From Swiss-Prot:
Region (Disordered): 111-141
Keyword RNA-binding: yes
Protein name as catalogued: Large ribosomal subunit protein bL21
Any one GO cellular component localisation term in the record: cytoplasm
Low complexity composition-biased segments: 118-133
Family classification: Belongs to the bacterial ribosomal protein bL21 family.
Record GO biological process: translation
Pfam families for the chain: Ribosomal_L21p
NCBIfam families hit by this protein: L21
One MF term in the entry's GO annotations: rRNA binding
Protein keywords: Ribonucleoprotein, Ribosomal protein, RNA-binding, rRNA-binding
Gene label: rplU
Known role: This protein binds to 23S rRNA in the presence of protein L20.
PANTHER family linked: 50S RIBOSOMAL PROTEIN L21, LARGE RIBOSOMAL SUBUNIT PROTEIN BL21M
Length: 141
């Protein structure tokens, strides 16, 4: 299993190819465009760990921006007892959803996301015989 720990938005994320993650809004990137995360703190490739000091040089995590969205609403309610003072406010954090495509070290991809055509199983129409092929009428089944 290959994974990397990257830093984005002041937070650290454990990322794996083929998975998507929600990070704080990346305003400078448009939807469905590639984005490189260059602040890689650690890479684990088949048990071999590469640790940065603080970042791994020549390491890049390639991602694609799937969408910009807003998170769930969080209600903030402030109340001072016995004073009839109440404030109810809501907050929705702006987020960006990233799909991790590959983890690269020194320009060599260590792991890539499986393509969608490989992951989708093919339908086999011959797997289940129809009623006409078996000779049993549909009423008796």
């Amino acid at each position: 299993m290959t994974y990397a720990i990257v830093e984005t938005g002041g937070k650290q994320l454990w990322v794996e190819p083929g998975r998507f993650y929600e990070v704080d809004r990346l305003a400078e990137v448009e939807e469905n465009s590639p984005f490189d995360l260059s602040r890689v703190l650690l890479i684990n490739h088949e048990g071999q760990i590469t640790l940065g000091h603080p970042y791994v040089s020549e390491a890049v995590v390639r991602a694609r921006v799937l969408q910009h969205r807003r998170g769930d609403k969080i209600i903030v309610y402030k109340m001072r007892p016995k004073k009839k003072t109440r404030k109810k406010r809501g907050h929705r954090q702006p987020l960006t959803r990233l799909l991790i495509e590959s983890i690269e070290l020194n320009g060599v991809p260590l792991a890539t996301a499986p393509s969608r055509t490989e992951a989708a199983p093919e339908s086999n129409p011959e797997a289940a015989p129809s009623a006409a092929a078996t000779g049993i009428p549909a009423d008796e089944e």
